[in-house]
Design a protein with these regions (language model features):
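Beta-propeller-forming repeat regions
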Residues: 1-151
Length: 151
């Protein structure tokens, strides 16, 4: 059983116990507050595997999950923002993460310059937007929406 959960350090700065009609834990950040009641169902979390991108000096910033192959199994789509890649990973039969496809979304940043640019790619979603009943990968990069249709 995992007893420590990593919190996004940029979002939450403090964890405090509170009583709001029952025991709870609050997560406090500069512009956000969340609370978790300590009652109800108890979940046991178990680490299955871990993944480090093979992209040299890469930084995995965010992840979404979706079935991009039509197999009925979801893949993990990591947004790698240091070198601007999408990195697809899936679980094998032994519940181990296996690298799949990866590609660079763009070669260089826009005219705004890199100093104050947002991490790119910054948003992804998996949905059928082409109307062929197959999930597609939708990516927000700079001021563009890119659609990668499933073949």
């Amino acid at each position: 059983m995992v007893k420590n959960l990593d919190l996004p350090v940029t979002s939450f700065a403090a964890v405090k116990p509170v009583t709001l009609g029952g025991l709870a834990v609050t997560f406090i950040g500069q512009n956000s507050v969340a609370w978790l009641p300590l009652a109800g169902d108890v979940w046991e979390l178990t680490k299955l595997d871990e993944y480090d991108t093979p992209i040299k000096d890469g930084y995995l910033n965010d992840v979404v999950a979706g079935d991009l192959t039509g197999s009925g199994h979801k893949q993990l789509i990591f947004m790698e923002t240091a070198k601007n890649h999408l990195d697809l990973v899936q679980f094998d039969k032994n519940r181990k993460l296996v690298p799949g496809d990866r590609w660079k979304v763009f070669e260089q940043h826009t005219f705004r310059g890199r100093d104050n640019a947002l991490p790119e790619p910054r948003e992804c979603a998996v949905a059928d937007v082409t109307g062929d009943k197959k999930n597609d990968l939708i990516v927000l990069v700079h001021d563009r929406i890119l659609v990668y249709p499933q073949e």
